[in-house]
Amino acid sequence: MISVDFSKGLVPTIILDDQNGDVLMLAYMNEESYHKTLETGYTWFFSRSRNELWNKGATSGHTQKVKQIWTDCDNDTLLIRVTQIGPACHTGKKSCFFNLIKEDF
């Protein structure tokens, strides 16, 4: 198995909808949340604001069932394809990326 580089503590983790490839959210994993994700098959992250682990959907029911886990060429960023149940964003939106800044460059 490929080793993920947790030497800086947290690893950016991009979550994609496995059904259509849409970007759902960006969160951070530490080594513990990564291993909990591997063990349970559901996403676990590290909350920088609360300084604790959190299981996506544990409160809301909007869970993320892991389908695939990828790493980038440096092994310090993760991309996880999931089956998303309900919205991914805490605002109730499907994706956390719904604020367009600029288009038509």
From Swiss-Prot:
Its cofactor is Mg(2+); Zn(2+). This is Phosphoribosyl-AMP cyclohydrolase. It comes from the Bacteria. GO terms for cellular component: cytoplasm. InterPro entries: PRA-CH (IPR026660), PRib_AMP_CycHydrolase_dom (IPR002496), PRib_AMP_CycHydrolase_sf (IPR038019). Disulfide bonds: none annotated. Coiled coil: none annotated. Homodimer. The keyword Amino-acid biosynthesis applies. Mg(2+) binds at D72, D74, D76. GO terms for molecular function: magnesium ion binding; phosphoribosyl-AMP cyclohydrolase activity; zinc ion binding. Keywords: Amino-acid biosynthesis, Cytoplasm, Histidine biosynthesis, Hydrolase, Magnesium, Metal-binding, Zinc. Its EC number is 3.5.4.19. NCBIfam families: PRK00051.1 (NF000768). The gene is hisI. It catalyses: 1-(5-phospho-beta-D-ribosyl)-5'-AMP + H2O = 1-(5-phospho-beta-D-ribosyl)-5-[(5-phospho-beta-D-ribosylamino)methylideneamino]imidazole-4-carboxamide. Catalyzes the hydrolysis of the adenine ring of phosphoribosyl-AMP. Belongs to the PRA-CH family. GO terms for biological process: L-histidine biosynthetic process. HAMAP family: HisI (MF_01021). Pathway: Amino-acid biosynthesis; L-histidine biosynthesis; L-histidine from 5-phospho-alpha-D-ribose 1-diphosphate: step 3/9. Zn(2+) binds at C73, C89, C96. Pfam families: PRA-CH. Binds 1 Mg(2+) ion per subunit.
